[in-house]
């Protein structure tokens, strides 16, 4: 299920929903700001004082304690430092949370999300887990998205409100799926960024600035993302001999490694990919397509 989030005027989303936001770091503050500006009655709480001042000026109510905040909201949004922080704050408040809906957008692992969902179920709390695919400045703007899993009823009930933050994607009742998808997407992002850093380091000794390299890398890498669906079709089909693919032998990255070394820079990022390629070549699959490195990752040695 996917919806297109927007913030068109006040009272957007679910009318008459009282919301409490626990955690006013950069992300929590951004989430709360969107809710307040949309006209929702919003109570906010943060461990350290002062962070609520700007939100209070916009119309939010600052709670003196986390318990006060929880008791003030039908919907409780938690955006804290980590999984341990969530339990530290919420465990003493399980009774107050009973009968309410908890949306946890704290960064957690899939297993931690499932554990928290089980804790919530035992306490009579409706649980929805969220993975935010945006930086704080993007919340409520085009390009922002939030991945959800957990209670389908909670997602349907509060979907209009959740859409205020960005496009809402729901992945099912397994509370860990949103986190898993979130981390998988971040894995792709960080490997891509590492590739950019590798390239920028390689050309730097030749007097090329990172900014100049970026102006060429961005359109090139954007164009290359068109291959994702082609690779996906090969992976899902399980046949790496399909014609039209670049072979693993042709994809050998020895020249890139040599060039990087000649420039006097590290080549760890490329060496990682080369290792995935060589494993398949050494196993006798050199004439098969590049997508086969998926098997090096899917079934590690």
Identify the meaning behind each predicted range.
Residues 2-78, 136:
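NAD(P)+-binding Rossmann beta1-loop-alpha1 motif at the extreme N-terminus of oxidoreductases
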Residues 42, 62, 126-128, 169, ...:
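Hydrophobic beta-strand scaffold residues
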Residues 66-126:
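Rossmann-fold NAD(P) dinucleotide-binding segment
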Residues 108-190:
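Rossmann-fold dinucleotide-binding core
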Residues 177-300:
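Helical "substrate-binding/catalytic lid" subdomain
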């Amino acid at each position: 299920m996917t919806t297109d989030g927007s913030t068109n005027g006040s009272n957007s989303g679910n009318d008459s929903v009282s919301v409490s936001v626990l955690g006013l770091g950069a992300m929590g503050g951004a989430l709360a700001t969107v809710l307040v500006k949309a006209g929702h009655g919003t109570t906010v709480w943060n461990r350290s004082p002062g962070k609520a001042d700007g939100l209070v000026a916009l119309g939010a109510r600052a709670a003196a304690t986390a318990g006060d905040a929880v008791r003030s909201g039908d919907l409780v949004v938690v955006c804290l430092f980590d999984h341990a922080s969530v339990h530290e704050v919420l465990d003493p408040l399980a009774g107050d949370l009973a009968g309410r809906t908890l949306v946890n957008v704290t960064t957690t692992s899939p297993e931690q999300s499932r554990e928290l969902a089980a804790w919530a179920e035992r306490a009579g709390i409706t649980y929805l887990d969220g993975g935010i695919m945006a930086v704080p400045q993007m919340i409520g703007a085009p390009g922002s998205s939030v991945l959800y899993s957990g209670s389908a009823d909670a997602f349907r009930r509060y979907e209009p409100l959740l859409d205020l933050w960005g496009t809402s994607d729901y992945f099912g009742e397994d509370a860990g799926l949103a986190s898993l998808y979130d981390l998988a997407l971040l894995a792709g992002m960080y490997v891509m960024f590492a590739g950019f850093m590798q390239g920028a380091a390689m050309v730097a000794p030749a007097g090329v600035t990172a900014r100049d390299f970026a102006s060429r890398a961005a359109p090139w890498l954007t164009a290359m993302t068109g291959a994702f669906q082609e690779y996906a079709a090969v992976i899902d089909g399980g046949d790496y001999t399909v014609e039209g693919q670049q072979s693993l032998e042709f994809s050998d990255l020895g020249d890139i490694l040599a060039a990087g070394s000649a420039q006097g820079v590290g080549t760890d990022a490329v060496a990682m990919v080369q290792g995935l390629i060589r494993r398949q070549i050494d196993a006798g699959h050199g004439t098969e397509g590049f997508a086969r490195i998926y098997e090096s990752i899917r079934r590690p040695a």
